[in-house]
A protein has these predicted regions:
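Short beta-alpha connecting loops at secondary-structure transitions
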Residues: 10, 101-105, 133-137
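Short alpha-helical scaffolding segments that buttress acidic/His motifs in well-ordered protein cores
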Residues: 25-29, 77-85, 99, 119, ...
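Charged/polar positions within long, soluble alpha-helices
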Residues: 57, 86-89, 93, 124, ...
Length: 183
């Protein structure tokens, strides 16, 4: 069980805010592109993703000692965390989290920061246009990560003229988010 209380997050320091915030994004996105995603989890993933893009930079800026508090951004990030947690508990996570646990543990990198460093590479790997169906989970459909990333790009407002452009814009937006929070 997790207790997510925005009041406890109001004074979270900048590095913890950036790392935990990008971890929330990774939870939501990995659950959304999962072959185990369902109609139940999809909406949660989309909502959490949108909230992270809308509120993580604000929450991060409010984390500095001399900054004006932003309780709305903190509360929205707490909600995004809870929503993404419910989604990934049902749809599961992917290789980004698997790799970041090892990378973070070995090099003493905060978990969310490790997720952020790997995220664009994992998105590109997962977005192969001709994925193969895994025999291990033969009852599940083919991976459709590329289409899912395109949907998320459209959701956050970075649509291109083609799906490929939208995907590239999605990657750029995720990279920009990292810059906005100094990762």
């Amino acid at each position: 069980m997790a207790i997510i209380d925005a009041d406890n997050m109001m004074k979270l320091p900048p590095r913890a805010t950036q790392a935990s915030g990008y971890d929330v994004l990774t939870h939501a996105v990995e659950a959304y592109v999962s072959t185990f995603a369902t109609e139940y989890t999809n909406g949660m993933c989309r909502d959490a993703t949108k909230m992270v893009f809308d509120y993580l930079p604000r929450a991060y800026r409010s984390a500095f000692r001399d900054a004006k508090p932003d309780p709305t951004a903190r509360e929205k990030m707490a909600n995004a965390s809870a929503i993404a947690g419910i989604a990934f508990a049902n749809a599961f996570l992917g290789i980004n989290h698997s790799l970041s646990h090892k990378l973070g543990g070995w090099f003493h990198i905060p978990h969310g920061t490790a997720n952020a460093l790997l995220f664009p590479f994992v998105c590109r790997f997962n977005a192969q246009r001709h994925p193969y169906k895994m025999g291990t989970f033969s009852q599940y459909k083919y991976p459709q990560a590329f289409e899912r990333y395109v949907e998320l790009g459209e959701l956050i407002g970075v649509k291109g003229k083609t799906d490929e452009q939208t995907f590239e814009n999605w990657i750029k937006a995720c990279q920009q988010l990292k810059k906005d929070i100094d990762i």
